[in-house]
Amino acid sequence: MNLAAMDPQTYDTQLEHKRIKLEQAFAQFETPSVEVFASEPANYRMRAEFRMWHDGDDLYYYMFDKVLNEKVRCDQYLPASVLINQMMSALIAELKPNPSLRHKLFQVDFLSTLSGEILVSLLYHRQLDDQWRADAAALKTKLSSQFNVNIIGRARKQKIDLDKDFVVESLQVNDKTFLYKQIENSFTQPNAKVSVKMLEWAIDATQDSEGDLLELYCGNGNFSIALAQNFNRVLATELAKPSVDAAQYNIEVNGIENLQIIRMSAEDFSDAMAKKRSFRRLEGIDLDSYVCNTIFVDPPRAGIDPDTLALVQGYERILYISCNPETLKDNLQLLNETHKVTRFALFDQFPYTEHMETGVLLERR
């Protein structure tokens, strides 16, 4: 974190520097002009995590500033959603005078939504007892007069959900509203409004598609659910069980009938497609019946492994969302041999940082 860089007055300048840096880094691939999708300059993060500092009777949130090389008190936090900032004030006022709720509390995580829900996770260096549960229930009741809130307590090998451990986000994407179950401690795009722009860009990039879509690393179905409208069928893979469970919920609640999720890694799916191995999880699924001309990938920061990259290269069109330009660049060294970048986008998920979320559409030469 660099608090000094978080100045809305300089946001446009910082974003322009990112655009120039990205175009220069990928110049060798003869990409089209970068499509730039800006963030709100403040209150854009739908989740935030804070450490807790105990100083006598005082208790406050803090973060570590890497530039100053010291902890910084955070009574409010400019990047966080308005809802998180409101909850920060209300929560700390209740925690300070309560011995049970504050004892050995070392971290608080917030997960909020544009739809008005917020989930608060309290993390402790001690086991949570019945007194904590009673006080946490009373805290939830009091906060519920102002917020649509749920509370989770966490300690070593212990998790207590007072009600539920998820929120349901509502995103307006073009003329459609999509609902997404987002589970505590699972990956979600932190900048919801930029996430909407990413979905709209992906839908536009794949309009008039023919055949089916294969998606690897689908998470909670964020992209595959929105993209299903452009394809006959969608087949998606994800390894993390909580994400798969959320994806199944999201498929049902959004009424998507042409999307199937398989719980397996991209590496195993590559082996299955190459018929190197058979998998029980694929029983009853005829992979050969899918006519996937397009593949969508949103890999982790490490990029795509060599076997999966070889699989990806076999498709006519590749839609690649990357959270790490360096690994995207490495992967493009191979993909550029057979495919040409026809769309190139910068999504500013993380203002005031060096981080760049990018999207490329590649089509076979």
UniProtKB/Swiss-Prot annotation:
Catalytic activity annotation: uridine(54) in tRNA + S-adenosyl-L-methionine = 5-methyluridine(54) in tRNA + S-adenosyl-L-homocysteine + H(+); uridine(341) in tmRNA + S-adenosyl-L-methionine = 5-methyluridine(341) in tmRNA + S-adenosyl-L-homocysteine + H(+)
Pfam family, one: tRNA_U5-meth_tr
InterPro entries (alphabetical): MeTrfase_TrmA_AS, MeTrfase_TrmA_CS, SAM-dependent_MTases_sf, TrmA_MeTrfase, U5_MeTrfase_fam
Signal peptide positions (record): none
Enzyme Commission code: 2.1.1.-, 2.1.1.35
Superkingdom field: Bacteria
CC terms in the record's Gene Ontology section: cytosol
SUPFAM superfamilies to which the protein is assigned, alphabetical: S-adenosyl-L-methionine-dependent methyltransferases (SSF53335)
Keywords tagged on the record: Methyltransferase, S-adenosyl-L-methionine, Transferase, tRNA processing
Keyword DNA damage: no
Family: Belongs to the class I-like SAM-binding methyltransferase superfamily. RNA M5U methyltransferase family. TrmA subfamily.
Name of the protein: tRNA/tmRNA (uracil-C(5))-methyltransferase
